């Protein structure tokens, strides 16, 4: 018997009113499906969200333990297992996901097999095991049949473009996703909808459509209880306010920080965001990470040194960065910082060039503002912003 059934039965012995509470949390019209679930091993709910919501409300500190045990005991040929695969990926529970992927690929159910193969490509692309070209080629060979994987095959490419700073293809690709085709599995449809909201908020941020950016982030927050999506929604709202409202940007970053205290990776993301915010506004910066050698953290070290006229230290860091391989978006920031240090117009124009190559219409403001201060033609700068 799975751990979740054992835990629920034990709690019911002490408080039988929990049955009605759980039915409400699970979105059930009455407790009957709960009785079936508790009294028949292998029985699942019609929608995966029911078990997720019960675990989150009753056992929040044991979610990973209970859901791992539950997911890995599911028959991989079922709708519940396919939902579990999306649950694992959405929550970045990769140990659960990888076991499910391997089991699904080798199972006899064609639908589950297709899910396994598509999510396998997603994992390998995310981990740089394969290139974008190889991913697209393998997806094409699958001749995808299910509407869920038709959508996810596009979502996985969108995540790749976002992570590599290649924003140019994203707006057109996301238009190809039609979630109305998904009718069998509402859990997957709803999580994919949240994914689309989060991705759209990033697309709108990089298009400099900031009101729309915040609207998509708010839709994501309203539609999910998944920490990952909540975190990146607060992050994007904060980023959208980066140049216009220091206090509100900081407020959203701190909200994200507060909900991610137990997640080291998310905690680091918000510390980096708060660091960048303080550097942009040229404030005292307690968020600098002097222990890290990542490109982002090194750039923010240099950024802080430049703000406080510690030019020799800034140059030392930028010289170190010159030896590292950057993507276009990172190069844009690198040239912006060199321009700040040297008061060099050519560097600011190089920064603009690379922001344009990565299609980042938001952070391109950084070099444009510096050129404006240097007296460059305002009309020219407005044209460069297009």
Curated annotation (Swiss-Prot):
Which terms under GO biological process does the entry name? latency-replication decision
Keyword Transcription applies: yes
> Is Transcription one of the keywords UniProt gives this record?
yes
* Record-linked InterPro entries: AimR-like
Keywords of the record, alphabetical order, are: Activator, Latency-replication decision, Transcription, Transcription regulation
Task: Name one matching Pfam family.
Answer: AimR
| Protein purpose | Transcriptional regulator which is part of the latency-replication switch system that decides at the onset of infection whether to replicate and lyse the host or to lysogenize (latency) and keep the host viable. Activates the transcription of the aimX locus. Transcriptional activation of aimX seems to lead to the productive viral replication (lytic cycle), aimX possibly acting as a regulatory non-coding RNA.
Q: Outline the subunit composition.
A: Homodimer. Interacts with the viral arbitrium peptide, this interaction changes the oligomeric state of AimR from an active dimer to an inactive monomer leading to lysogeny.
Indicate what this protein is called per its UniProt record: AimR transcriptional regulator
Name of the coding gene:
aimR
